[in-house]
Amino acid sequence: MSETSLLPRAHGAAVLSAAMRSTPDDFQVDELPAFEPSGEGEHLLLTVRKRGQNTAYIAKKLAHWAGIAEMGVSYAGLKDRHAVTTQRFSVHLPRRIAPDIAALDDTQMQVVESSWHNRKLQRGALHGNRFVLTLRQVQGERDAIEQRLQAIAARGIPNWFGEQRFGRDGGNVAAALAMFGHVQADDGTLLPAPTSRRRLRHDQRSMLLSAARSALFNRVLGARVAQGSWDGALEGEAWMLDGSRSVFGPEPWSEALAERLARFDIHPSGPLWGAGQLRSTDQAAAVEQGALSDPPSIALRQGLEAAGLKQERRALRLRPHGLEYQWLEPQTLQLAFALPPGCYATAVLWELGDVADAGRFNVDVRADA
């Protein structure tokens, strides 16, 4: 059973079933850049349109093309393999002499734009991502589907971490527990994990820490959805500013806060677990602690704290920007919308219903980053 298969739906029962990614063209993602190139400097920014390949493969190909070490190629985020995606890469060329860019173009990738910049591309340096998703074999009443889409556009959705974060059948969370010295029995109890001499690479360890953190966040968000407060206010709420990681509060409920919440200027937040005190207090903190009071959650919390991670926050609510839809055929529905960095298109699909994803296990860990 996966970490996301039993998540509650905020807008009610599923209104459709469908299939996605029978071809890469059914899942298109375009990065929304956070800045314009300076036109000078020793970092060549390449906007690459790729098909059927993951980000790491393209980065390695660019390094080989430029004759530099792979660490000289940077990107803002990982993108799906089983998709058609557009994203920026930076290639460090101190002499400002680039090989023939046209030599990069093939059936897997095309360079659609290039420019020089005065610094390398940093992870997370993007405004967001624009998605165009095509759902096929759609089953469900058209009126109900369209009403659900309108509700999503108006009210937003829970800001779940998507299934890509957790690996096949949620295996990354079990692996994180094992890394912390535990194994979960079928009845939910914890047992000591067998001693392993295998050392994890840094990237593997980071992936498991992220999976553990994400699972705990989803459990808190699940509790808020179940009580109907995922897009509202509890006493002791820690608020997150829309479009940023800035957090403020808790503070007394006021008309001003209510207005900001209604216009999506602020969102309630949940914990990205680590060492330190929860930012929330009172009722909000009680919900968070209660949702994470079972033995596996406690073990994950303790493991994250011991690993040196610090308490952070993530918005509980997400609003897709510019949500549009059109019926290409009676059973083919195309969706288009933009999401902030670190948010998952699969969270939008979950509020619609059950979508079978042919590319489900051919994606990067941060497929929607």
Swiss-Prot record:
<comment type="similarity">
    <text>Belongs to the pseudouridine synthase TruD family.</text>
</comment>
<feature type="domain" description="TRUD">
    <location>
        <begin position="156"/>
        <end position="318"/>
    </location>
</feature>
<dbReference type="Pfam" id="PF01142">
    <property type="entry name" value="TruD"/>
</dbReference>
<protein>
    <recommendedName>
        <fullName>tRNA pseudouridine synthase D</fullName>
        <ecNumber>5.4.99.27</ecNumber>
    </recommendedName>
</protein>
<dbReference type="InterPro" id="IPR042214">
    <property type="entry name" value="TruD_catalytic"/>
</dbReference>
<dbReference type="InterPro" id="IPR050170">
    <property type="entry name" value="TruD_pseudoU_synthase"/>
</dbReference>
<dbReference type="GO" id="GO:0005829">
    <property type="term" value="C:cytosol"/>
</dbReference>
<dbReference type="InterPro" id="IPR011760">
    <property type="entry name" value="PsdUridine_synth_TruD_insert"/>
</dbReference>
<keyword id="KW-0413">Isomerase</keyword>
<feature type="active site" description="Nucleophile">
    <location>
        <position position="80"/>
    </location>
</feature>
<dbReference type="InterPro" id="IPR020103">
    <property type="entry name" value="PsdUridine_synth_cat_dom_sf"/>
</dbReference>
<dbReference type="GO" id="GO:0003723">
    <property type="term" value="F:RNA binding"/>
</dbReference>
<dbReference type="GO" id="GO:0160150">
    <property type="term" value="F:tRNA pseudouridine(13) synthase activity"/>
</dbReference>
<comment type="function">
    <text>Responsible for synthesis of pseudouridine from uracil-13 in transfer RNAs.</text>
</comment>
<dbReference type="GO" id="GO:0031119">
    <property type="term" value="P:tRNA pseudouridine synthesis"/>
</dbReference>
<dbReference type="InterPro" id="IPR001656">
    <property type="entry name" value="PsdUridine_synth_TruD"/>
</dbReference>
<dbReference type="InterPro" id="IPR020119">
    <property type="entry name" value="PsdUridine_synth_TruD_CS"/>
</dbReference>
<dbReference type="InterPro" id="IPR043165">
    <property type="entry name" value="TruD_insert_sf"/>
</dbReference>
<keyword id="KW-0819">tRNA processing</keyword>
